[in-house]
């Protein structure tokens, strides 16, 4: 019995489809590193965030540890949806969020988009 998947062209197509499924193009949207002038413009869209080298950071303060952890839990869904994950430092009632695009070697539009979402979750 002859199978279409035994043909080299079919194997290449199947491989390409598998890769496209595993790595959708939306995961790579907005991943070009920004220039410093672009960063300077973008940082204005996320008040209270600070640039530290190739990272942007912001510390959120809450009434207690429980509220701080509840905030962190709210970050899971948007981070997963964006396929972009912040670095988090928790110190009792404070959560410091840091964003960078490691694969791009610096800050990208994705960092600022996620920073806006995180700011909304954190109350502005």
Regions found by a protein language model. Give the residues of each.
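Bacterial N-terminal signal peptides that target proteins for export
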Residues: 2-14
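Bacterial N-terminal signal peptides
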Residues: 13-24
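Conserved, structured core segments of small domains
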Residues: 25-124
């Amino acid at each position: 019995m002859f199978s279409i998947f035994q043909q080299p062209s079919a194997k290449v197509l199947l491989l390409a489809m598998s890769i496209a499924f595993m790595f959708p193009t939306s995961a790579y949207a907005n991943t070009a590193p920004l220039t410093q002038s672009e960063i300077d413009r973008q940082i204005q869209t996320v008040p209270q965030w600070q640039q530290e080298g190739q990272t942007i950071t912001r510390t959120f303060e809450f009434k207690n540890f429980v509220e701080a952890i509840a905030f962190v839990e709210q970050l899971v869904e948007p981070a997963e949806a964006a396929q972009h994950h912040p670095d988090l430092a928790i110190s009792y009632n404070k959560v410091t969020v840091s964003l960078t695009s490691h694969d791009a070697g610096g800050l990208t539009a994705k960092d600022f988009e996620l920073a806006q979402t995180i700011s909304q979750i954190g109350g502005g």
